[in-house]
UniProtKB/Swiss-Prot annotation:
Binds 1 ascorbate molecule per subunit. Binds 1 Fe cation per subunit. It comes from Matthiola incana (Common stock). Belongs to the iron/ascorbate-dependent oxidoreductase family. The keyword Cytoplasm applies. Its cofactor is L-ascorbate; Fe cation. This is Flavonol synthase/flavanone 3-hydroxylase. Pathway: Secondary metabolite biosynthesis; flavonoid biosynthesis. Its EC number is 1.14.11.9, 1.14.20.6. Catalyzes the formation of flavonols from dihydroflavonols. It can act on dihydrokaempferol to produce kaempferol, on dihydroquercetin to produce quercitin and on dihydromyricetin to produce myricetin.
């Protein structure tokens, strides 16, 4: 099973070691007793469900525009028999303040913005703590990873309607996360699977737990010490599956490569430095061509 880390443990060094070990061996773990109120998580899920229950025309008032990362959109995916499946998504930048564009934030339900902003504050604190532990696990100062990867936060909701042919359709195809760190809440419908030891493992649903994925940027910063977990999502035949990822990344103009302190003649860099925007462009182009 995917490691579960209890953040209420009074021994912070033990917690940090557990997070580091999970990031080295799995590239994914779940955290419980993380300090984000259960009631807030329930409200976050409630307003997310209510938004996706709105008529399509009303959701389109938040539609993503050409060239924008943010906003509401619908992806039509084909299963292996060329039948259409639907994935609805909304992306909202929450940090830094200069990146926030309320043009894309839902006006309904009325408390959507308040709840999402409160959750964004909590999850930023949690992600910074995790990045501090990961930096220390590399023998570096606490700020090392955060200074590069903790610069841009985007909140996302994935909404996967029921699909009768779910055995032949992935909500998201196998991939590693393009960003550095992803913190995910899901509803009770299973579907997230991670690849380890040559087989797919279903991530156990734990109410109010947060799933943490190591992505490409932290893998590169660590010169490969931390794994970028390969994962996919499945859909349910009868019930709607939803997830609430927060994507933590560098800003587009930042250049990312192995941290210099981690490389030497005996341990040369495994990755070439590259601007994050170029990395994103290259990977998206590759995935499009692959599909």
């Amino acid at each position: 099973q995917v490691p579960v880390v209890d953040l209420s443990c009074p021994d912070e060094e033990l917690v940090a070691r557990t997070v580091v070990k999970a990031s080295e061996d799995w590239g994914v773990f779940q955290v419980v007793n993380h300090g984000i109120p259960t009631e807030l998580i329930q409200r976050l899920q409630k307003v997310g469900r209510e938004f996706f229950e709105l008529p399509e025309a009303e959701k389109r008032s938040c539609a993503r525009e050409a060239g924008s990362v943010e906003g509401y959109g619908r992806r039509i995916e084909l299963d292996i028999k060329k039948r259409k499946g639907i994935v609805d998504q909304i992306y909202l930048s929450t940090w830094p303040p200069s990146s926030v564009n309320y043009r894309y934030w839902p006006k309904s339900p009325p408390d959507y913005r308040e709840v999402n902003e409160e959750y964004a504050r909590h999850v930023k604190t949690l992600s910074e703590k995790i990045m501090e532990w990961l930096s220390e696990g590399l023998g570096l100062g606490r700020e090392a990873i955060k200074e590069v990867n903790g610069c841009w936060y985007v909140m996302n909701i994935n909404h996967y309607p029921p699909y009768p042919h779910s055995d032949s359709f992935n909500g998201l195809e196998p991939h590693t996360d393009i960003n550095g760190l992803t913190l995910i809440i899901t509803n009770e419908i299973p579907g997230l699977q991670v690849f380890k030891d040559d087989h797919w493992i279903e991530v156990e649903y734990i109410p109010s737990a947060i799933i943490v994925n190591i992505g490409d940027q932290i893998m590169m910063l660590s010169n490969g010490k931390y794994k970028n977990v390969l994962h996919k999502t499945t859909v349910d035949k009868e019930k709607t599956r939803m997830s609430w990822p927060v994507l933590v990344s560098p800003t587009y103009d930042m250049v990312v490569g192995p941290l210099p302190e981690l490389t030497s003649e005996d341990d040369p860099p495994k990755f070439k430095p590259i601007a994050y925007k170029d990395y994103v462009h290259n990977k998206i182009t590759f995935l499009k061509n692959k599909s």
